[in-house]
């Protein structure tokens, strides 16, 4: 795509610094990704890249940012990959803005992704900063960086996930209804849950930690026997009653990951179904597993994952069980807040990031005001034109652009346009 750049004569280098930078991005072909053109990641990557793309492979994640495990590159004038975004930022630190530079140094503090999930990801959690530093020092090959990884998933399609521990009353009902849990952890330990109340938060955490750790630590032979028993019982009962959503999910998980302890542990987690345009966020040390659908995900710049089930990748069950916060309750679902015509903001309680969704009808226009921090823009639908004081660019599906700090953006659509902006959390940039 041709890019017409007009640098004002009186603006010089400062105007050029604020010019939008078109990016080429990295993809991951994890086996849980959707295949070929069924994958949103594939379709975005096909539009974003000049490479020959294999339509028979899974396309799981598109990474936009500076993490070394999946770097983005500036697009050169001839359309080829230039320097990495991180290298360019190192040479142009003012593009981050002073507050961001002082807080996080010369790097983008967030990582933006597109996910296309065909089958469940692992049951996992991400460490806080203290644990991340310890894990990275001890096992740098497994844990690639020393940062924490709070994150937010914004549904693009219907999106399903397991997220956080269910409320105490629901957990009591689960222990009563699923005898296989008691078989795995022992009746004395399982029955502890009936002796606690929500008012004693520390006791609740202690009991849930004990039960969950015993469950996840069961040996392979016992797990295989109990999962098979659970499967047989649910199939028999399905002839006489309608299974719950969670029970149907557990049978589906068992088909995909037979004999996996993650099948039974799913009963402990909230089963969340997001509609397009809804989001959930996850702090450090919170268990979760994405199940199906497509989403935009933004997180602190990290790739640290501790896994404990529903995967063929290496597990670290004891670390996961010891690191979890064991907070109980349904997660907050963000619907977004309309901040100006056509723009909805999703603002999680993390300094590193927020996401704006711009749904711009054909022929309409809007403005992203200048902010003292960097942004990444991703176009997922339609065409239009984007202008700043330094440039005027045509945009279309698959375009990814880096926006330097202090850059006001004017948008006009020539067809229905859907665009996402990931940036620094406004509460950090504009403290009260």
UniProtKB/Swiss-Prot annotation:
MF terms in GO: mannose-6-phosphate isomerase activity; zinc ion binding
EC number: 5.3.1.8
Tissue expression profile of the protein: Constitutively expressed in both vegetative and reproductive organs under normal growth conditions (at protein level).
Entry binding sites for Zn(2+): 124, 126, 151, 288
Keyword Repeat among UniProt keywords: no
UniProt induction comment: By light (at the protein level). Down-regulated by dark (at the protein level). Down-regulated by DCMU, an exogenous photosynthesis inhibitor.
Sequence similarity: Belongs to the mannose-6-phosphate isomerase type 1 family.
Name of the protein in question: Mannose-6-phosphate isomerase 1
Organism of origin: Arabidopsis thaliana (Mouse-ear cress)
Gene: PMI1
């Amino acid at each position: 795509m041709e890019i017409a750049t007009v640098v004002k004569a009186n603006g010089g280098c400062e105007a050029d610094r604020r010019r939008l930078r078109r990016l080429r991005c990295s993809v991951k072909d994890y086996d849980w990704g959707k295949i070929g053109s069924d994958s949103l990641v594939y379709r975005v990557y096909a539009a974003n890249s000049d490479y020959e793309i294999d339509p028979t492979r899974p396309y799981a994640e598109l990474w936009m940012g500076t993490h070394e495990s999946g770097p983005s590159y500036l697009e050169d004038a001839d359309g080829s990959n230039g320097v990495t975004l991180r290298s360019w930022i190192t040479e142009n630190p003012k593009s981050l803005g002073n507050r961001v530079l002082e807080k996080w140094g010369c790097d983008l503090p967030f990582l933006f992704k597109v996910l296309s999930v065909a089958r469940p990801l692992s049951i996992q959690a991400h460490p806080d900063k203290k644990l991340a530093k310890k894990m990275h020092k001890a096992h740098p090959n497994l844990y690639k960086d020393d940062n924490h990884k709070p994150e937010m998933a914004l549904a693009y399609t219907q999106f399903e996930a397991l997220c956080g521990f269910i409320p105490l009353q629901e957990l009591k009902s689960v222990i009563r209804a699923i005898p296989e849990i008691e078989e795995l952890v022992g009746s004395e330990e399982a029955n502890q849950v009936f002796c606690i109340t929500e008012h004693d938060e520390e006791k609740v955490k202690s009991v849930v930690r004990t039960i969950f750790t015993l469950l996840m630590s069961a040996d392979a032979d016992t797990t295989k026997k109990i999962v098979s028993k659970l499967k047989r019982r649910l199939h028999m009962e399905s002839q006489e009653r309608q299974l719950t959503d969670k029970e149907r999910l557990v049978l589906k998980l068992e088909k995909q990951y037979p004999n996996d302890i993650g099948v039974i542990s799913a009963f402990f987690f909230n089963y969340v179904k997001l509609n397009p345009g809804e989001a959930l966020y996850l702090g450090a040390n919170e268990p979760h597993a994405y199940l199906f659908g497509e989403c935009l995900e933004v997180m602190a710049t990290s790739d640290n994952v501790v896994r404990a089930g529903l995967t063929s990748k290496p597990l670290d069950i004891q670390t996961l069980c010891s690191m979890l916060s064991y907070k109980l309750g349904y997660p907050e679902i963000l619907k977004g807040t309309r901040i100006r015509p056509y723009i909805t903001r999703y603002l999680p309680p993390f300094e590193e990031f927020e996401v704006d969704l711009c749904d711009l009808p054909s022929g309409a226009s809007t403005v992203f005001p200048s902010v003292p921090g960097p942004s990444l823009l991703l176009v997922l639908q339609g065409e239009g034109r984007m202008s700043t004081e330094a440039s005027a660019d045509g945009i279309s599906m698959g375009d990814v652009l880096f926006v330097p700090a202090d850059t006001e953006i004017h948008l006009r659509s020539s067809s229905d346009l859907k665009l996402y902006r990931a940036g620094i959390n406004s509460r950090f940039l504009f403290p009260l």
